[in-house]
Amino acid sequence: MAKYNEKELADTSKFLSFVLRHKPEAIGIVLDREGWADIDKLILCAQKAGKRLTRTLLDTVVATSDKKRFSYSSDGRCIRAVQGHSTSQVAISFAEKTPPQFLYHGTASRFLDEIKKQGLIAGERHYVHLSADEATARKVGARHGSPVILTVKAQEMAKRGIPFWQAENGVWLTSTVAVEFLEW
């Protein structure tokens, strides 16, 4: 595997997140309903848009991503963001899964007043993202400021018929979390 510096890997990961989750049209690619993009087309369109992207760089980003944000298709010809989409092109059909008793959501303290009013909502994304452990939730919350960890009564939600899904990178997904299922 070729050597790339951390900044190059981080910049490429951010670029891939942008085009594979949110704005594929920014470089002229189309994703299928499951979020897959043809790798050759992605590389070509990225290069036309002035972004240095190669298959080796893609392989390195996919292999070294601590959050496993991206995956390859079984034939190795396509790539997708595992979850976190806001583009209407994508509607990944995750298998419903029974959650553990509690899941966690990391946020910044400045968002608490709004969360106390309306619970957790997906916003521009398709799902609310939840973590199986507090440490991961804390890292997520720290990206937005002073982190606050909310405990989600996931099994109680599931018992009331609210579905959960789990992306292949371990992130738990649900449509919304009402205030009654949150512990501060």
From Swiss-Prot:
SUPFAM superfamilies the record matches: ADP-ribosylation (SSF56399)
Protein task: Removes the 2'-phosphate from RNA via an intermediate in which the phosphate is ADP-ribosylated by NAD followed by a presumed transesterification to release the RNA and generate ADP-ribose 1''-2''-cyclic phosphate (APPR>P). May function as an ADP-ribosylase.
Protein name per its UniProtKB record: Probable RNA 2'-phosphotransferase
Domain of life: Bacteria
Keyword NAD: yes
Pfam families, sorted: PTS_2-RNA
GO terms (BP aspect): tRNA splicing, via endonucleolytic cleavage and ligation
Organism in which the protein naturally occurs: Escherichia coli O9:H4 (strain HS)
